[in-house]
Amino acid sequence: MSNRIDLSNESLIDTKATSSKGNQLKWLVGGKWYKADHMGYEGLCEVVISRLLEKSNVKDFVRYHPVMIAFDSKEYAGCYSDNFRAKNESIVTLEHLSKQWLANSFAKELLQYEEPKDKIRHTVEFIEKVTKLKNVGAYLTAMLELDAFFLNEDRHTNNTAFVLNDDTGEYRYCPYFDFGLSLLADTAEDYPLGEDVYQLIGKIHAKPFDRDFDTQLDAAEELFGSQVRLSFTRADIDTALNDVAAYYPADIIERVRDILYAQRKKYQYLFMK
């Protein structure tokens, strides 16, 4: 039995800047964020990935839950999560920080550097300078490891962010979140259902330091070491997919299962021995 909520009388939140693939329907209601699927099965990705991260050394991440959303006489599969931002806090993206401090887009800033390692080093130094946060290299490396494993194609400079305390001016890290465009979720445009999964994986372009996931991942790990340790099994993958089986067709469930099994085999070094 699926969970359902009617948001027809609620106001939409503008999300144009936070995704490279259009404006996803999004609401903030009663201290919870609701997101409707826009390109394919984003909600499934958020839920399943957060379930799997429970079996890892990653402690600070957003936990998502599946939901059917009624809005404007239509029904959407999607997900919801608790709002991790307090009333006196704002989300500040890397792109916003760059425009504020450098008067330039950070995506353009990165064009000054050819090697991914130099791009990552520059990014870490800039973030630490303006936010005063420590261990930014470890934080970004873990993000790149998770993005590579889960094939997240949407980690651009408007989708890397920090939490600002509006009263004190102090920053803290965002929990790891926003994995919606992972696991070939975009079935509407780039990764149609019915096509060979492994050929589609080869088409994915990573962000923001290189188009290849492993190239930017290797560069970050050379600088800051490997950060993420996973411990979920194939049975844990099956359990996570069972949690969303009432919301998505069987062919989507099986496609994601195949992808996760393959990624688990490829990135064995990330798993706890």
Summary of predicted features, one role per range:
Residues 21-25, 116-119, 131-132, 209-212:
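Short hydrophobic/aromatic-rich motifs at helix boundaries and adjacent loops
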Residues 63-72, 156-166, 273:
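Short alpha-helical "patches" and their helix-cap loops
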Residues 118-185:
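Conserved kinase catalytic-core segment
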